[in-house]
Amino acid sequence: MSGTKKVGSAGRFGARYGLKIRRRVAAVEAKMRQKHVCPVCGRRAVKRISTGIWQCTKCGAIFAGGAYLPVTPAGKVARRIME
């Protein structure tokens, strides 16, 4: 079963867990599945390999990031401090 119009990919849960939770899951999954900017080459070509591991499809760079997004708020702060 694919998604539904209201909750997209979270439609796989059917009527379980409540609409608010399913909408939240759908929003996180949509952000996770889109292409992200590579920190090495700057191209929008980063895809998630597994939990917290991201790879650029153009330059092949593999790096660790957040579970659902390649850059977390804490990671942004740490990078700013290091620079």
Swiss-Prot record:
Alphabetical keyword list: Metal-binding, Ribonucleoprotein, Ribosomal protein, RNA-binding, rRNA-binding, Zinc, Zinc-finger
Ligand binding (Zn(2+)): C38, C41, C56, C59
Keyword presence, RNA-binding: yes
Family matches, as Pfam families: Ribosomal_L37ae (PF01780)
Cofactor(s) needed for function: Zn(2+)
UniProt record, GO biological process: translation
Ribosomal protein found in the keyword field: yes
Record GO cellular component, one term: ribosome
Subunit text: Part of the 50S ribosomal subunit.
Membership in a protein family: Belongs to the eukaryotic ribosomal protein eL43 family. Putative zinc-binding subfamily.
Protein name: Large ribosomal subunit protein eL43
Organism: Pyrococcus horikoshii (strain ATCC 700860 / DSM 12428 / JCM 9974 / NBRC 100139 / OT-3)
